[in-house]
Amino acid sequence: MTQVVHVPLGDRAYDIHIGRDLMGQAGALIKPVLQRAKVAIVTDSNVAPLHLHRLKEALQSAGIAHAALILPAGEATKSWAHLSQTIDFFLNEKIERRDVVIALGGGVIGDLVGFAAAILRRGVRFVQIPTSLLAQVDSSVGGKTGINAVQGKNLIGAFHQPSLVLADIDVLDTLTARDFLAGYGEVVKYGLLGNAPFFEWLEKNGPALIAGDPAARSEAVRVSCQMKADIVVRDETEQGDRALLNLGHTFCHALEAATGYSDRLLHGEGVAIGCALAFETSARLGLCSQEVPSRVRAHLKAMGMKTDISDIDAAMPEPEDLFALMGQDKKVVAGQLNFIMARDIGQAFVTADVSEAVILSVLEASMDPRSA
């Protein structure tokens, strides 16, 4: 059964379809948003062999003309060079402002294609077909698009909402165990930031998600998308509540920068570590009891996930250098670094009242495998 989460943003409202075999139904689902039967698809070298043919068949059966660009897979694709290549592809395909382009892939492709759509002809529409768990529950929803800079991640971009999101649960079967767990880092984040009952549900049903239970996976994606949609509607451009979605990300982005945005640390793995460190920091500040971060770590470890910097298989900089990398975070306001802290599971909030000394002590402990 397909479930639909509606994102009510006025004339930019859209639906998120969650269910099985949505790739096979893509032509019929996309056709109503088209003004002419033509689309341009951008995907990557990992996704194309797995899913591009199926999407093309669905579009062809619906009478929709299409062309595809296949980019290299990996975080390095979120660059000026690949943005330029994508825009050249759209222009060569004569994509007009009223047309639709399709992002078929994980978070990297979704972010890149969304940004290209935002700036092409001052804004063309785009459809997200996320093929990773991380993209289905996070990056494909909410309109954040962008690329990376030398100075940090996601520092160049725009808010540009999709016209439709198709989250096909079946494509998750093609993910490696590591990639699925990386996406789970974003799923568990929703329970930690504002939905304690969902975190409890994950503690019970996490093994079923890993085992491939489609009903459990659909429910996890639905709840995650609904939570994100509710927050985005309240605060589309991250002036308030939406910042809560960055729980764990200040630590995460510094760790990603330190590992060169490479496969030594996947984004969702960094989020999981970041969430564990955010709750550890909260406990050290006296905002919550030590039992809370212990419970968070216990669940992440039970799912086979990284929880500490010492779990990263790479040489890491000193705590002071990691803290300096945090200074490039998007949540810096007037030179002040804001953190997402928590009073309990499901009770996150934004604060700048976190001393450098506390952060350094948390980083140092997390780098020591004896403290894990």
Model-derived regions: residue spans:
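ATP/NTP phosphate-donor binding region
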Residues: 1-100
